[in-house]
Design a protein with these regions (language model features):
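Glycine-/small-residue-enriched transmembrane alpha-helix faces in small-molecule transporters
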Residues: 1-40, 76, 84, 145-170, ...
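Specific alpha-helical transmembrane segments that line the substrate/conduction pathway
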Residues: 37, 43-47, 86-117, 157
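Juxtamembrane helix-start motifs in multi-pass secondary transporters
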Residues: 38, 177-181
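Hydrophobic transmembrane alpha-helices of multi-pass small-molecule transport proteins
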Residues: 50, 54, 72, 120-140, ...
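C-terminal transmembrane-helix exit sites in multi-pass transporters
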Residues: 52-58, 104-126, 142
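Specific transmembrane alpha-helical segments of multi-pass solute transporters/efflux pumps
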Residues: 57-95, 100-101, 137
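Loop-to-transmembrane alpha-helix entry segments
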Residues: 65, 98-101, 117-137, 144-153
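Membrane-interface helix caps and helix-loop-helix hairpins in membrane proteins
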Residues: 87-92, 140-148, 200-202
Length: 202
C-alpha cells in the first residue's frame, strides 16, 4: 500500500484540479446557454450538493451571521472571476482565456507582498517579468477589437481570482475547508446571476 503524505496529496489534488480547469473553458464554449448562466448553474449544483453534505455532517452548527458575512468575501471574488472569465471565453480564443486568467499567481504574490509583507525572491521578479512580457506581446499582437476585449476581461478575471485565493488562504486559518467551499459556491452565484441578467438585457 502506498503511503502519501499531505504535501504529496496536495500536489496531486492541485494537478488534477488544474487538468479539470483546462477542460472547463472548452465546455463553456460548447454550452448552449449564456456564459454567466452556465457558471450560475455550475455554482448552484455545487451549492446544492455541498448543502446536503453539510446537513448530513452537522457542518452548519455554531455558525454566526458575522462568520457568514466573512465567508461571503471569497464567494463574491470567485463568482466575479468566473463571470468575467466566461465572458472572455466567448470573445477570445479558449487558449488565451485560459492563459491570461492563470496570471493570477503574479497578482497574488504582489498583493501578498503589500498586505502581508510576504517576501519575493529574484526568481519571482524574473519569472513575473517574463510572464507579463509574454502577456503584453500576445495582447498587442491582436488585430480584432473583440479578441482584445476578451483578453482584457480574462486579465481582470485573474485579479478577482487572486482575491479569491488570498481570502481563502487567510480565512482557512479560522474556518473549515467545507465552510469556505460551501459559501464560496453560494455567494458566487450572486455575481453570476447579475451577469446573466446583463446578458439578457443585451
Amino acid at each position: 500500500m502506498i503511503n502519501l503524505n499531505s504535501r504529496t496529496i496536495g500536489i496531486l489534488s492541485t494537478s488534477l484540479g488544474a487538468m479539470l480547469i483546462g477542460v472547463a473553458p472548452i465546455l463553456v464554449r460548447m454550452s448552449e446557454i449564456s456564459p454567466s448562466l452556465t457558471g450560475f448553474y455550475r455554482f448552484l449544483v455545487a451549492t446544492f450538493i455541498l448543502f446536503i453534505y453539510g446537513i448530513a455532517k452537522n457542518k452548519f452548527i455554531n455558525l454566526k451571521f458575522k462568520d457568514i458575512l466573512v465567508l461571503a468575501i471569497p464567494g463574491i471574488f470567485f463568482g466575479s472571476d468566473i463571470t468575467l472569465w466566461h465572458w472572455s471565453i466567448n470573445q477570445t480564443s479558449v487558449a488565451n482565456a485560459a492563459l491570461f486568467v492563470n496570471t493570477a499567481p503574479i497578482y497574488v504574490a504582489i498583493i501578498s507582498y503589500f498586505l502581508f509583507k510576504d517576501k519575493l525572491d529574484m526568481f519571482f521578479y524574473f519569472a513575473g517579468l517574463c510572464c507579463l512580457g509574454g502577456v503584453f506581446l500576445i495582447l498587442f499582437e491582436q488585430n480584432e477589437y473583440q479578441t482584445f476585449t476578451g483578453d482584457l476581461l480574462s486579465l481582470v478575471a485573474a485579479v478577482f481570482y487572486s482575491g479569491y485565493l488570498i481570502s481563502v488562504k487567510k480565512f482557512s486559518e479560522t474556518y473549515e475547508t467545507f465552510h469556505l467551499m460551501f459559501f464560496s459556491a453560494l455567494f458566487g452565484c450572486i455575481p453570476l446571476y447579475l451577469g446573466s441578467l446583463l446578458e439578457i438585457g443585451q
